[in-house]
A protein has these predicted regions:
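N-terminal anchoring/stem segment of glycosyltransferases
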Residues: 1-69, 116-118, 173-174, 188-206
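Short, solvent-exposed loop/turn segments at secondary-structure junctions
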Residues: 9-11, 36-38, 78-79, 103-106, ...
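Short amphipathic alpha-helical segments and helix-helix/interface helices
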Residues: 17-21, 59-60, 85-89, 136-140, ...
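A structural signal for short, well-ordered beta-strand segments and their strand-loop junctions
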Residues: 28-33, 72-75, 98-99, 149-152, ...
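Short, flexible loop segments at the rims of nucleotide/cofactor-binding pockets, characterized by
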Residues: 46-50, 77, 130
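GT-A fold catalytic core of metal-dependent nucleotide-sugar glycosyltransferases
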Residues: 51-107, 111-121
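Catalytic core and acceptor-binding pocket of nucleotide-sugar-dependent glycosyltransferases
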Residues: 118-206
Length: 206
């Protein structure tokens, strides 16, 4: 199965030191590097919308290249804690797409498993045609076009606990997580600190 990801120079350290370093040997990695159109790489800074638009373009290409098969998309601010392929397939079941739960009934466009079919391809194309600010808003506005569900909270974000932006506070982390997505914080340095905190807690508990 293919796992797709995309990043610019500001997120290279996340790609090499966290995503690739912890990714289980179950996938063919299809990585796309894009220009640094957002100078900081930070959430909603100038150029962020263009960067997110590149993700939507990638969703379309990935779907077209895998018709009749399943694929995964993952942001690079993600680390893994074991094998996930079979669990993702099981959780997807007969749905078209299963996304990380970003809390508040919001589907996260930063980590999902997708059955590449006409419904999901149409959804991704509608996201591009009706693009609204960034990829996640666009996904949630068009996801009704296919059969969707949330992944279990083993596919973890700190937002499951805090429901607010993380600024360095100590948090107890569930012991059974399989994936940690370092969203719900702003800036590459904060993402690194959050990834390290979660890794340390899981390694200690293990």
């Amino acid at each position: 199965m293919k796992i797709y990801t995309i990043h610019s120079n500001s997120h290279e350290i996340l790609y090499t030191d966290y995503f690739l370093k912890t990714l289980p040997d179950e996938f063919d990695v299809i990585s796309t590097q894009i220009p640094q159109e957002c100078s900081t790489g930070d959430f909603y800074k100038p150029g962020w919308d263009i960067t997110c638009y590149r993700k939507v373009e990638l969703f379309i290409r990935a779907c077209e290249d895998n018709m009749g098969e399943k694929f995964i998309f993952s942001d690079v601010d993600i680390q893994f804690f074991g094998n996930i392929k079979d669990i993702l397939i099981e959780e997807l079941g007969d749905y078209d797409i299963a996304c990380q739960n970003d809390t508040g009934n919001m589907y996260c466009s930063g980590f999902f498993i997708c059955d590449a079919n006409e419904r999901t391809l149409n959804m991704f194309k509608k996201m591009k045609e009706n693009y609204n600010s960034e990829d996640q808003t666009s996904l949630n506005q068009q996801i009704h076009l296919c059969k969707s569900k949330f992944l279990s909270k083993r596919f973890f974000t700190i937002g499951h606990i805090t429901h607010s932006v993380w600024n360095g506070q100590d948090i107890d982390i569930p012991k059974d997580i399989l994936v940690h997505h370092a969203n719900w914080t702003i800036g590459t340095n904060n993402k690194i600190n959050l990834l390290n905190m979660v890794r340390k807690k899981i390694d200690y508990n293990g």
